[in-house]
Amino acid sequence: KLKLKEGQLLIGLCWRTSKQSFHDLRVEDLAPLKSLRDVVFLAVQYDDCLSELDQVRSLGLPIHYYTNVDQKDDISSTCALLGACDLVISPGTAVFQLAGSLGVPTIAFDAFKCYFDKIPWYPTVRELELNPDKPSLLINEIINEMPEIIGWANAVTTSGRYIDSYSGEL
């Protein structure tokens, strides 16, 4: 069981699709996220990612993962994990679809942005464009805009949990 300190955010992190395409982030792209303070990351990657998690951790980004949850075939447990998150970051996968369906504030990224800030059928999903040649731009945008993202997440959350106590600084 994850225990968060007061003011910490739980961010669910999915960095790639199962088919591994240009819509994905690479493990090394995630390293700058370690600059975010008062954040706990939870891997919500729905396939075997244990070796990638070792790589992520070796880059200095602590991330939790529940090995006892089959995030691909046990939808109810996956939804419980996603529902516990204050924010989810994911490419265009089932993870973002489930989080959006649950009303969890979600940053969805894709190489082809739909050219509207929010997806009409998922009002708690904000879409950001991923430049496959420069994925660091997306990560830097998330890091630099985290206070605004928190404000947006508080405005759209349907969980009733507000994360305005976040005290992280860059």
What does each model-found stretch correspond to?
Residues K1-L170:
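Catalytic machinery of carbohydrate-active enzymes
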